[in-house]
């Protein structure tokens, strides 16, 4: 895994009331939130399957619409950016494609991810949605 997502499954859909009153022009959405355990996201989600030299770090990540409901938030997309930056440095170092990093240099990427990019010596006092670490039991459908 290259990063972990902790956000609940957060799916938006048109509000049925607005569908009735504004057919085809729904402007207000409702959401379904499902609490999840944090889960790891594979590095392979961060590069294109059919364009050799294309990384995707953000809401264009290669996932299903349900998985996008958990990875589209800012903290998680920031972690994607860190991993893609590390992988891009290896692409330059080895004149390799993102897919090559997975096949030939994954251990080196893991080593970079283990070190991290954070500034050393700063307190780790940031709070975020801790997903499955809450006292709620995630729903599995």
Region spans (language model):
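Flavin (FAD/FMN)-binding glycine-rich loop and adjacent Rossmann-like elements that form
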Residues: 1-141
